[in-house]
Amino acid sequence: MTKKAFLVLEDGSIYPGESFGYEGEAYGEIVFNTSMTGYQEILTDPSYAGQIVVPTYPLLGNYGITSSDIESSQIQVSGFVVRQYCEEPSHTEVTGTINEYLTSQEIVGISEIDTRAVTRKIRSKGVMMGVITVNISPEQALQQLKNKPSYDEQNFVQKVTTNERYQWTESGLGYDHIADNLRILVSDYGLKYNILRILKGKGCDVEVFPSSATSNDLLAQNPDGILLSPGPGDPELLDHLVTTTEDILGKVPVMGICLGNQILAKSLGAKTYKLKFGHRGANHPVKDTASGRIYITAQNHGYSIDPESLPSDVTVTHISMNDYTVEGIRHRSLPALSIQYHSEASPGPKDNEYIFDDFLEMVKETK
């Protein structure tokens, strides 16, 4: 028999539903994602650490869980809120249901929620903390929530980064080998596997380092380039990553994605700020300021670069066509570029993988 469950927001809003996945309590920042597919990639994206994710699409789990759709070693979200989930998925590679997947990793979910009503709340009020509760009352859960640290107070990068450096060997399919034998190091702030697949597929020698690696640790490897990965949390808490990036700028080409974009910007003297409800979905239009071309991008971020704080030697290369926030920057003289959206997609459109080519061409030019 299905147990009752409740989604409780920090403003006191209570949404009754039914438990699925693991039965317990889950605390986190409530965010919504507008993607229609790709739920397994979303669940395993480390950038969602500390967050309870609300997909706006009403039916989740219809193609089940597969071994090929993971973006990290485990589920990363704190909780999952859905309107409805499928108990009998259909897929040639299915290994289980979404309910079984959440249960096996002790991730709390709630179904039968009006997810679009929750989304409207977040759009109008902004992101806020919340809790999914199964075993205690909504009133008790709200009281416990008040004693939990806010999302912005927690360093999630140190929770999701790798503990040890490792070589990546799995190659993505269908890529031109434009970068044979280029040695690329990836600083793991909470990376997705598809970044590594793309780099390897293009011919790179790829090694991943923990976020605690110093500039000396990285430069001692004599890399041809360094990629600053996506990741969760507030960049204001990550001064050590900014310092490390400052130390490597000008010594080796650098590319940043999402959180890596914010870290690069801060290392160049810019400031960041929190968005009201962030950008999370697979259909965000972004304009390339040089060509004027519009790309549809996958996004997952809650912070952005303050364009007024960018120094004069940094140019804005991409902007959001939804709210005109900064979506990419490039230094005018140093070999450094970054983007706010997810060029690796997973899930989402692959139109923007050309950014990896731009980075690798920059690396080859500086060798």
Model-predicted regions and their roles:
Residues 85, 231, 334, 344:
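Flexible loop residues that form catalytic
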Residues 108, 183, 253-255, 271, ...:
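Proline-centered loop/turn at the N-terminus of a beta-strand
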Residues 114, 258, 301, 342:
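Active-site glycine-centered loops adjacent to acidic/histidine catalytic or metal-binding residues
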Residues 183-188, 297-298, 337-341:
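Active-site-proximal beta-strand elements of phosphoester/diester hydrolases
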Residues 224-225, 229-296, 304, 348-366:
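Cysteine-nucleophile active-site neighborhood
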Residues 292-334:
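Catalytic beta-strand/loop cores that center a nucleophilic Ser/Cys/Thr
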